[in-house]
Amino acid sequence: MRVPLSWLSEFVTLQVPLADLLERLPAAGIEVAEVECVGADWDREKILVGEITAVRQHPNADRLTLATVAYGGGRTIEVVTGAPNVTVGLAGVKVPLALSGARLVDAYAPEGGTIVLKPSKIRGVRSEGMVCSEKELGLSAEHEGILFLPEDAVPGTPLAELLGDTVLHVELTPNLAHCLSLAGLAREVAAMGCGELVARADALAEGGGDASAAVAVRIEDPDLCARYCAAIVEGVTIGPAPFVLRHRLRLAGIRPINNVVDVTNYVMWETGQPLHAFDLDRLRGEPGGAPAAIVVRRSRPGEAMSTLDGARRELAAGTLLICDGKGPVALAGVMGGLESEVTDATRRVLIEAAQFDRTSIRVTAIGQRLPSEASLRFGRGVPAAGCPGAARRAAELMRRHAGGTVARGLVDVYPRPQEARTVRLPADEVARVLGANIPEAEVRRILVSLGCTVAAAERGALAVGVPATRLDLAIPADLVEEIARITGYHRIPSAPMSGEFDPPCPDAALDAEDRACDALVACGLTEVITYSLTDPAWCLRLGLESDASGFVCLANPMTADRTHLRRHLLPGLLETLQHNLRHVGRVAIFELARVYIPGGEQLPEEPRRLGLLLSGPSSPPWWGEPEPPL
């Protein structure tokens, strides 16, 4: 996850230097893989904010124009450009201006190539500088047009002052799903003592019709969709989002699309709640119901749909879908459908904020090969409590940036509301698990800073009320882990293991395997370890099995070519041979491992087997000797 510090600062006021923050985050289990300083390599005297004052046609080229650019202090320069968005008559637009001597990314060179700008004649006209695209500045891969800056940008200002930022590339383990948002990460930073949370109060101006009269929402399987919220914004005008919003999305690694779609991504980055925007006028209703309908259900046999990427997708049985009154309009939590996408003609938008079952979303994303930021978050767990707030936040931002009005109310279907959870933390549990004595006052402070409530319980224990946003806190060990993280693992003293250890028990079978492996290695073979998962087609082609019924099948395979547990070692050895023959002519390998034989209703048998594979000359070739036999 990419975290621009300027954006994070809207949620937490940092009170420590960046170097200290970078030291504390890994100590709490939040790895920072890279620190990207955007604009640090922009020359502050040669890469500036410019204002286009006039554009005229190039006298010798139909596809080029001459732009007069002012850059403060009465200074102007004329540059040649072929950008399609710099047209004759354009004026008053702020753009990035690079003067002679500036170093830029070469938009037409391989990744990482740069150029130093020099005065040049282009089709007979001298150009002293360049107006820049996003790619030439290193902001993104977009280079079809010039980057237009905010209207209030001051000509002559170093571009680094306007667009410069520090972006943290944060790598999060699955247990830190609550940090997949700026709000969640900000709470962690504040809990560590590195900053203070910023109080945010987002008002929502409602003025349209009643949302419940425009759409009806029905959940067929509450086990797969615990909550579904729908907000409606009417009278929108589709266009580019404001510059600040687009720039932040670029820094976060998200390509801007339009003001409506960009708002859904923006709010997801802020809150961690994935959102989707439907064209409300393209959603069909159910007979006798509201004009539009949302039905959350499993797929039916033979169903298919076209997704936003233009692909026609066959749906596996049980795939969770978002449907209207006629059929599927989205793969729930993964990707929207073409039939309901937001287009330039969209005037009414339905904003979806829901909680979907994490396992179901992972199965769909893997099966359809559609990983996304939304499916990543749903797959790790999204709390139902955040749905209404995220939907309202997105509706308000769309009202501001796309016009229109927000319909009154929120359609909120929540069949089984989540009950408040309390975890009992015994008085000695922290010291028992961590081996460190952390004062109770500090334990209370840490838990409260993470959003928990803490009350005294019997026998010195603490009754910890878990916030609805933390799905991962369920048992005392979870709370102890949080206390250890926020304290800092580096502050917990290490102690060597002590006490008596039982002597190892002799294992005749294991000793025999070790002797066999040693003997094979002494004969020149190499031991390999291959996948326990396989494709039965290998065994069918080799004649080892007549059909696939004799294999243990995985209920949720990660890939299409690793769907069953192996019955034989030979397919894995042949795959290894296939790979190694690209590099060497002689392969001598063996594997000693388990195979899996179905046992009916019982667990499969797991006998250990030895497989050997020899290919090529019987010994390595040697200079001056005849070629060895195969």
Q: What is each residue range found by the language model?
A:
Residues 2-8, 164-173, 226-234, 373-381, ...:
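Short, hydrophobic beta-strand segments
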Residues 104-133, 138-144, 214, 338-393, ...:
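Internal insertion modules embedded within essential enzymes
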Residues 5, 23, 28, 37-39, ...:
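Glycine/proline-enriched, intrinsically flexible loops and inter-domain linkers
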Residues 184, 423-590, 597:
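Extended, well-folded interaction surfaces typified by the phenylalanyl-tRNA synthetase beta subunit core
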Residues 1-209, 350, 367, 373, ...:
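Phosphate-backbone binding interfaces of nucleic-acid-interacting proteins
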Residues 239-242, 246-265, 276-283, 288-414, ...:
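TRNA-recognition modules of translation machinery and tRNA-sensing kinases, especially anticodon-binding
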Residues 208-222, 226, 394, 413-423, ...:
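Self-splicing inteins and homing endonuclease
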Residues 189-220, 402-430, 436-437, 479:
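Terminal amphipathic helices with adjacent charged low-complexity linkers/tails
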